[in-house]
């Protein structure tokens, strides 16, 4: 887990995207390259990456952190995208958000040469997006070694319901 200083760089927006939600925005971290480098270092040293073949990053903020980790560890990165964003043969699943419903897709061809994956995202709230990606990978006969996130909303206790290890850098 990272320092309290990093958690202060996360901006919070009350009643966004809907009333009752306090949105945690990781984008201000990108304005602090030294802290961002430390964050990526912390995320990259997690045990869950040791036995993984590749990374699946979740649309869209997960791409930022997944790309940096992919480059640091020299591991391939596959993207899980929102509807209508990927060509080719896809695996698609729906999931529930704190504030609605959506779906994600992964290209079948992108994962065919790899067996084990770490899922990377910016934030763990209810666990819906991580489970969605997990279900797509399992449907394809793949393994999940864990989930790596920048921020975890600890009060929602999503990690208790996820069937794989969770590594978080900041817990609110």
From Swiss-Prot:
- Could you tell me what reaction this enzyme catalyses? AMP + diphosphate = 5-phospho-alpha-D-ribose 1-diphosphate + adenine
Q: Where found, per UniProt?
A: Cytoplasm
Name of the protein described by the UniProt record: Adenine phosphoribosyltransferase
Signal peptide region:
none
Which family does the record assign? Belongs to the purine/pyrimidine phosphoribosyltransferase family.
- EC primary class: transferase
**Which PROSITE patterns does this UniProt record tie to the protein?**
PUR_PYR_PR_TRANSFER
NCBIfam families linked to this entry: PRK02304.1-5
Q: In which pathway does it act?
A: Purine metabolism; AMP biosynthesis via salvage pathway; AMP from adenine: step 1/1
Molecular function terms from GO: adenine binding; adenine phosphoribosyltransferase activity; AMP binding
Does this entry carry the keyword Nucleotidyltransferase? no
Lineage of source species = Bacteria, Bacillati, Cyanobacteriota, Cyanophyceae, Synechococcales
Q: What does this protein do?
A: Catalyzes a salvage reaction resulting in the formation of AMP, that is energically less costly than de novo synthesis.
Give the primary localization class. cytoplasm
């Amino acid at each position: 887990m990272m320092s309290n200083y990093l958690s202060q760089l996360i901006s919070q927006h009350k009643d966004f995207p809907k009333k009752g939600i306090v949105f945690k925005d990781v984008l201000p971290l990108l304005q602090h390259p030294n802290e961002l480098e430390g964050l990526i270092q912390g995320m990259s040293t997690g045990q869950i990456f040791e036995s993984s073949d590749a990374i699946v990053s979740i649309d869209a903020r997960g791409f930022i952190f997944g790309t940096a980790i992919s480059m640091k560890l020299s591991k391939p990165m596959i993207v899980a995208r929102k509807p209508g964003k990927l060509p080719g043969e896809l695996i698609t699943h729906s999931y529930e958000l704190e504030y609605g419903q959506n779906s994600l897709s992964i290209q079948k061809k992108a994962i065919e040469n790899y067996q084990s994956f770490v899922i990377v995202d910016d934030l763990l709230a209810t666990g819906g997006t991580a489970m969605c990606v997990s279900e797509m990978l399992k449907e394809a006969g793949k393994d999940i070694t864990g989930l790596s996130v920048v921020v975890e909303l600890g009060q929602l206790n999503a990690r208790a319901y996820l069937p794989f290890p969770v590594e978080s850098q900041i817990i609110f």
